[in-house]
């Protein structure tokens, strides 16, 4: 079959029109080794630090070590199928996680994938896990209280919105219980909560989810879980992922609370990754940048001003400040708060709540040591009524602790010393509080008023808790208007003091306990 010249030229024209001369740039490397969740890749010359690397089987890696001839990356997921000689590709993207209101009430892993069996998370919004913290110009001083509902914390170690308050103590001493109670107490306040579980047993996380659901707190809470069975890489990035989810609310003029439980295990995971990447070890075998690991995370918790929120939302939200409050948890070994990671985090945060094993075993729960616990900025944010009535509590406890040791050796004590010991014993008893029994501002103020004005002094120590329960029950039924007024305003004046006096004296007269 012969083709005419016109047909030949027509075919050539068709071929020319279909010809695609676009160039596809693809940075490709070869995996030279894979072991313990670390891949070494040769040939990725234009990769950036912290960039996502596409590995075989729809798995990604995170570039951490950039050497002259190779890249060390940590695998975010299973790596059993990856072998030497496989290809790896640059993506030009950094790691992002889903954010937004749709995550509330859900349990997700460190990459934001749902693990609660409730289907996909209905959000298209994502945010990088690593972000620069807001600068000094965009910040606002902490002056709004974040109520935990725990008497000993709100009266002596107050927490403000935008603060970083460390919870530190040995294992099995009630650190998580304080954090969970604080999350439950935010119900109805508009504060969104993020609980980041790092290196915990899956059964423990399931138990916390159940507790939050029982108390109606899951509706305003996101749980980010990197369990003990997850890789060190996921335990390392989980706090940053949770922080990005919290920043979504902060940057839109809302208040959020994030709990990191616990950063000791994150430091262990990072130490493991660093040693596998052959980075030089330092004190306690941690890498040199373990301080920066926690400082860049905790500096993102802040209270931002109206201008920041307006600029971030392109003018959609005006006249509102946003905050992200952080409660990092650190586990100590045998009460050693002078170890490397505890001292690092103490120096980064705005105060610490120190829990003691001896106090816990003696029945004082929460086992807070008021001498070592401090809040550096929360005093300015404390509710006025709690600030006024709580000052006497700290003083009474300090005097009691000082005299307690002395009184063991002295046989006869003068009346004033005996009165201080008497008051201290009853205040110590009053500060005991069961888990899941958080108090409103008004009920807490009522308890503190009774202690501060000597209404507990003539009670037996065993009668203090029953008296408090009767006092609260009476106030909520007979004096509900006073309780509502205090909860709404939080102010303290002569009128409020008179009303509190009437309630306490009414309860003392009835002796209903």
Curated annotation (Swiss-Prot):
Site feature: Required for activity: 373
EC supergroup of this enzyme: translocase
Keyword Oxidoreductase on entry: no
One Gene Ontology molecular-function label: proton-transporting ATP synthase activity, rotational mechanism
Subcellular location as annotated: Cell inner membrane
InterPro entries: ATP_synth_asu-like_sf, ATP_synth_asu_C, ATP_synth_asu_C_sf, ATP_synth_F1_a_nt-bd_dom, ATP_synth_F1_asu, ATPase_a/bsu_AS, ATPase_F1/V1/A1_a/bsu_N, ATPase_F1/V1/A1_a/bsu_N_sf
Residues binding ATP: 169-176
EC number: 7.1.2.2
Keyword hit for Transferase: no
Signal sequence region: none
Keywords carried by this UniProt record: ATP synthesis, ATP-binding, Cell inner membrane, Cell membrane, CF(1), Hydrogen ion transport, Ion transport, Membrane, Nucleotide-binding, Translocase, Transport
One Pfam family of this chain: ATP-synt_ab_C
Reactions accelerated catalytically: ATP + H2O + 4 H(+)(in) = ADP + phosphate + 5 H(+)(out)
Entry-linked PROSITE patterns: ATPASE_ALPHA_BETA
Superkingdom of the source species: Bacteria
Membrane topology, from the record: Peripheral membrane protein
One GO cellular component term: plasma membrane
HAMAP family in the cross-refs: ATP_synth_alpha_bact
Chain's role: Produces ATP from ADP in the presence of a proton gradient across the membrane. The alpha chain is a regulatory subunit.
Subunit structure, as described in the record: F-type ATPases have 2 components, CF(1) - the catalytic core - and CF(0) - the membrane proton channel. CF(1) has five subunits: alpha(3), beta(3), gamma(1), delta(1), epsilon(1). CF(0) has three main subunits: a(1), b(2) and c(9-12). The alpha and beta chains form an alternating ring which encloses part of the gamma chain. CF(1) is attached to CF(0) by a central stalk formed by the gamma and epsilon chains, while a peripheral stalk is formed by the delta and b chains.
Family under the similarity heading: Belongs to the ATPase alpha/beta chains family.
Protein name: ATP synthase subunit alpha
